[in-house]
Amino acid sequence: MHGVGTKPGTTINRPYPVVLDITRLASRVGRGPSTGVDRVEFAYLNWCLSEDSVPVYGLARISGGFVVLDREGLLSFRSKLLGELPWGRRDVRARLGIRTSTQRGAAESDLRRLAAARSGRESLPDIPLEHGVYLNTGHSNLSETSLSGIRKTGLKIATLVHDMIPLDWPQFQREGTVQRFEDKMQAVAGLSDLIIANSEGTRERVQYYFDQWGAGLPYVTSHLGVGQNSKILDISGDNRPYFVAIGTIEPRKNHALLLDIWERLEKELPHEQMPMIHIVGQRGWKNEDVFQRLDSMQNKSWLYEHNSMDDVTLRRLLAGAHGLLVPSFAEGFGLPSIEAAQMGVPVICGDLAIHHEVLGDYPVYADLQDIYLWKKTILEQTKQRQKDLVHAHRAKKPKIPTWSEHFDDVNAAVTKLL
C-alpha cells in the first residue's frame, strides 16, 4: 500500500494532539494500486503515529456514518493497509450494503470494530480532545457537515489542497464532479484555519479562488516528500529500450500524444529498433477514443498497458526505463517525476510551471504541440545505454524534497496556529 516515498524520516517533535482524517485511505481499499493522494494521506498517518507522547485519533466517514479510531485502532488499520494483518469478516451492515465491494466492506467492518466512537451521518462522534488540530490531506470528507462538526469541538482545521485542477480544467472532469469539488473547496475556504499547499503553483491557484470567496487564510507551502532511495534496485530484465508513463488514463494526462508518437515510430523504424512504451495506470473517464486505440493496439509488441501494477514492480520498471514521459496538460505536484529524478531516470515533460518549480533544469521540456521534438528526444535517448543515461542524469538531479522537511514545515505552521 505505502509504495515509494511515504516514510517520514526524522522530523522535529509534534507537541499537539491530532485528529487525522483517514476517509480517503478507508475508501480506497480494494480499488487497485494507491494513487498519489493515497500515498500522501498514508505518509501523514505514519507521521502522526510516530510521536507517542501526544494523543492521535483517526476520523473516517464510512457507509452509514462516522468512526473515530484511537492510536491502537490506527496502528491496526495501518497494519491491515500494509498487508501485515488480514482484513476481518464483513459484518451485517457490510453484507447488506449493495454498493460496497467485498474488500471495502471488510475494511469498513474492521473500522467499526476498531472504533473508539461511532455516529450516524448527520453528526460526528465525540472526539475526546479540546485542543489540537484536525488534518485533512485526502480531498475527502470535506463537507460542511464534517468541517462544521470539527469546529464545534474547538479543534483547529488544517487542510492540504493538492490542486484546483477541476476548476481550472473543467473540460477534463467527469460529469457532476466540478460542482462537487467546488462545494468542497468552498467549505474548506470557509471553515479551515490553515491551508497546506504542495507547491507555490498550487498555493497561487488556491488563493486565486479562495480570495474570490472572501477567505483570508494563512498558507504554508511545502513540497511533498519522496523517501530515501538508498536501495539498489533489481531493475527490469528486458534489454530493449523502453519508456514509462504513469497515471490514470484520463484526458488531462494526454496519452493520445504518446500513442501518436509510437504509431509514427512504427512506420519509420525497423521492428527490432522500436522502443517500447509501458502505460501504467487505471483507465479513467471521458477518454473513450484513447481506450479504443489501446484496445486496437493490444497485439503491438511495443505497447504494454498495466492497470493494476503494484508499487514495488512499478519502481523496478521505472528504474530501468530510458525515460519517464509526462505529456500532461496540467499537474498538481507530480510525484512520479520526482521519483524518476531521484533515480536518475530522464524525464520528458510539458512546459508546466510545477515541473520548473520542483525539477528545475532536470527534464527535457517539450511543447505539447511539438510531436517532432518529443519523437526526436525519445529516439536520442533510445540510442544511448540506459546506464549511461542514468549516470549523466544523476549528476544533474535537482534537490529531492523529503517528508522530514515537509512535516517540519507543517509542524511549524500548525504550532504557530495553536
Describe the residue ranges of each PLM region.
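Carbohydrate transferase catalytic cores enriched for Leloir-type hexosyltransferases
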Residues: 1-418
